[in-house]
């Protein structure tokens, strides 16, 4: 028992000494950016033009102010197959100049299991967006029992050098499952 306690004390001391090395940091450093605010994308509700992308801005990441008088900044009827979009997620690309946004292509008045698509958007000025509707059920075989495609998000995968889109899908009576795919270089597919 005494040997075990001595070993544990020695092991604990060695582990603690690793964290106490002078001048050593376990944090990854990131290059400083001269960005001055945070942009938040959101939708406001479940009816009419509430299912549309809006912008808000924050200087501290906690308090946000709606832009454009809290009106949509992108016409949902133009970019979607259903006439509405929800769950916007925006990402500044690695080049620092391009923005990708993904949204759920859905009008909730049609039912919570009525959508089969997402929309991929690309912009360099946050005003003018190119868009591409990805209808999973129409594009890929074996999706006959697909009920919904929800809440896509995008991240950059540095190991692959591509942008990954991940989202939730529900088939039949099962549970929602998270799927992912790498977008093409144009962010259209």
Model features per residue range: what roles?
Residues 11-20:
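Bacterial N-terminal signal peptides
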Residues 2-11:
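Bacterial N-terminal signal peptides that target proteins for export
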Residues 26-149, 155-189:
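Beta-rich carbohydrate-recognition and catalytic domains
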